[in-house]
Amino acid sequence: MRDERRVPLYARLPEIYRTKDAELPAPFQLRAYLALVEQAFGHIHRNVEELYHDLFIETCADWVVPYIGDLLGTSHLSGDPWTLRADVADTIALRRRKGTLGAIELLAYNLTRWGAHCVELRENLVWNQHLNHQRPDEGGLPPYGLPTVKRQTVMRGGTVTLRDPAMLALRGTPFDPFAYTADVKPPTPGGVRYNLPNLAIFLWRLAAYRVAVSRPVFVDFGAVGPVVAVRFNVNPLTRPDVPPAAQRERQPVRLFNTHRFDLFNAKREGTDKLDLSRVTFDLSLIDEVPGPVLLERLTEGAPAGAPEKYLSVETYDEASATLQRLDISDVGLQLHLPETSFAGEEWPVAQLPALAWKVRGANLCAWEAGLRPPLANKEIVVDPVRGRVLFGVNTQARADALRDQLLVTYTYGAPGPVGSHPVPRPAPSGLFAASASGPNFRRVLLRQNPAGLHDALQNVHLNPAPVVVEIADSFTHALDLGHPSLVEETSDEGVVGGPRSLMLNGPLLIRAASNQRPILKLQRPLRFRPAKVVATPPTDAAQQAELDGRVSNLTVRLEGLHVVRGENFPAGEPLIARAAVGRLEIINCTLDPEGFIPFGPSPPSPPARRPVRRAMNLREPYGFSAPAEEEVFKETPEVVVHRSITGPLHIDRGYTLALTDSVVDAGQGVGNDAAAFAVSGAGNPSSDWGPPTTVSGVTVFGRTRVESITGRGAIFVHALEARDVQKGCLKYCYFSGERKPLPATGPADRLPQNHACVRGSAQPAEESAVLRFTSEIPGEPGYAQLAAATDFRVRERGPADDQMGAYGFLLEAHKWRNLQIRFREFMPVGVRALLIPVT
């Protein structure tokens, strides 16, 4: 409990009273009495401070924001507290700039925190110059033309230049400079209509996440004459189960650019950070928005190329264990080359192209074999669509240095912070707060100690205090519970060569540091159990009660980790195979389901999707070989999955499961075969029942079969079956409405009571709700994001009048409504706003 004694009244008393108080037969009675007064006085003191802070929009409590808005005459909105606060804070400044493009863009950013760009579409209409009044700034003939108007310059209202791929790549984007004929059709959601009154407001909904300093996957060497080609996949996931010869089976990553305005605003401090109206920084410039990198604009030397806006190259001291001298730039992709082998080189930078090193964007589906012109020495080729980088060097020594020492900082896109992402994280709280800075806080850096994770787990079987293991980088860390250094900390349950479980004497937290996304590569499944379950001797009731209390408090928490399978991971095994603890928490993690589409030939014959693998297989009984331990273990382990992405969860009824703002993927999207189970029992998924389950904002790709279920805001893409339909209630959910396969008849769903839910195949047909996702493939930018074609009831009639599913907490429906309300107030007469999502 927080101590509220802000003013020490007892210490302010004259010393004579304190002396007499200490000399009483029962000493310090006055001090005890004043302690109660001090506590109440502290509450009053704190409340007075809060009342002062509530006078200012930058520091007031959330509930005060609409009252300050009333003083300004601002209409009330609902949604994310940050956006509402920014909307009120900038009210006066935006009113002064009402009707300008800058005000509209800033208003859109305040209400959504998305990238925004406004275009007056009348400027893109076809237009002919008056022969007697030619515009020099728009390409008038000499002597009316300006020197800045080059051969490749796009003329307003003119024809398309076909000789510059970098400029052509802008066609159909928010920065399209080409001319179009007038489009008189009525506006449609997300459609661009080029006409005089239309103002297009382009919005980048996907967030850009930057992984700072990771190791790319070296593929192999190639040769182009005397030039050595060094091939890398940017995605650090090695996929060791894929043989080296089958390179097309590895996982691509779509490279994104960073949002410069977000990065700029993140560097501002204090209350000034909220006041965006005073920022002179442009909100959305070409090549500086959080969208996919355009391949054609990466080519150096092209008239419209801008590789310096997407890519930077620097050298670093490879002998440094902490990489403190590493300079992270603001671009989407940064290559860090070893200083010893590449010292003194001149790299391409803005307005200063390198004399020797060149940059090119190209399709690297066949690596250097498909390049025209061929790969040259001191050339870097980037394929942002597949996430590949190719270097051309003239010596094998340099090629070896790149293979062993190259580091990359790259950016990718995702709908929001569900799964493992490099996001800011607060210090450990609750059960682990006391250990965040004490002797049980263990920091892991791969370059300082490659076996640091194993060392951090030393003595967890003896330490009764909570242990915090924080991984402070974004490299790949191997964890093997069968490692020789963990012999004392693990148990094989008396079976020689059997699976080993990590023994715990107190709570354990393994987390990513703030703004990091480490990869945890397992050599065998994770298994957890108490270090001691039965008292010694078993008849010692006091000791047994103490052990029972310790086991009930035994919590394992994984936070911010991307958990994958390693080289020797047993085939068919789940990532987590045992949780004989009080509570297992998976927070902001990705328990890699795989299921991705690997590198492969271009459409129309894309490669097949990789199989999906189980995330958990937790059985009852709980894996104790000694009957006495199994009998004494009284806990019903709680499994909590919060804002995470997992593969199938096969868990028996002896556990409880809580899913919040998460995605559970069995590889079965809308319209796919419904045979795979996403949540079910650990034995036979088709006949066993899963645990009692609570859901809140979850998207489930696959069938669900549980003992009972309650909650709200879930999307069940396939059938949901609850054994006990008399227990629990589901609200604001989507059910598939699937039918049982013949010869059986009737609905496949077995549902408890439900309220305000919709079905994909409802009767009558007009009541059915269409469900569509931007992508159903893990790792793709729009994974599990609801598409615009989804029924509005799914997008806007979930909990709190927002969307159902894993991303409902983002309040996107509120953002769209708030934009429409504010634009009606800010739009000039005769101007029609078109809201167009780019991602």
Set out the residue ranges of the language-model regions.
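C-terminal, active-site-flanking charged/polar segments
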Residues: A116, V381-R388, V393-G416, L720-Q763
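Right-handed parallel beta-helix/beta-spiral solenoid domain characteristic of secreted/periplasmic
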Residues: E493-P574, E594, F599, R610-R613
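Compositionally biased, low-complexity/repeat regions
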Residues: M1-S437
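N-terminal extracellular ligand-recognition/capping segment immediately after the signal peptide
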Residues: V88, Q448-L509, A513-R527, H562
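Right-handed parallel beta-helix
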Residues: T555-R565, R583-G595, E635-H650, T656-G669, ...
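Acidic/polar low-complexity surface segments
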Residues: A427, A513, K521-T539, I587-E635, ...
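Short glycine/acidic-rich loop motifs that flank beta-strands on beta-rich extracellular proteins
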Residues: D480-L481, L522-P525, A531-K532, G566-P574, ...
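Extracellular/surface-exposed low-complexity segments
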Residues: R739, A744-T839
